[in-house]
Amino acid sequence: MLKEIKKNNKLAFIFVIINFIIGTLLFYEALFRSINIILITLLLSYLPFIIFFIISLLSCHLKDNLKAIKVIKIVTKILTYLQVFYYFMAIFIIAILMSLNPVTNPKYYKFFVNSDELTKVFPKQIPKNVENVQFYYAPGVLQGSTDYVLYYIDENINLDNFKEKATWIGTKDEYTEVNGLLSGAFSYTPIEYKNEDSFVIYLIEGNCDDSKYCNHGKYLFAAINENTNEIIYKLSFW
């Protein structure tokens, strides 16, 4: 069957394989979202694959109709060019969907927090003896920030590791080194705009562009409230 499809429309067969691979790469992150987002992303990701697969089947079914085969091959070439524009649109729409529908289930933590950069501060896995675990991940689109946040309550916090790695230690309002860098430090965390100065920030990495307003920047830190045993890990870049 596959040999027959390949023989009658080689170009369509090639793009069946290519589009399946691209679709799988686009769809992967949607697996961790709601069922509605999964279904929408599934359609956007695999639509070109479905179209070229149907074309391949038609080429096989109509192999003896030379006129039909000629038309199908012309349509295949046209769609080959059009799919480039389609993927630009689909990637943008999927990126917006992923950004507006963040991952908040802690059981998916290890799928997203696995790079060396993140694990400089974030734990490689969520400790079992902690309470009130909350996780947040959302990729940025255009000027929006990409954010990773982990929050929990831990009665056995060890500060030594953070002190060794920190380039700066203090509360949010005490930070004056880079204008605007930590203005949204606690966004997407459970304590946003609430008792922010009760947390001591251990800033591991922080930098901004030369705009003086931090239009583009990045920070990585752990923030700890020793009175309540709350700890927040966060990476944000925009």
Give the positions of each predicted feature.
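Membrane-embedded alpha-helical segments of integral membrane proteins
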Residues: 17-60
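Non-catalytic accessory regions used for complex assembly or targeting
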Residues: 12-15, 27-35, 46, 75-76, ...
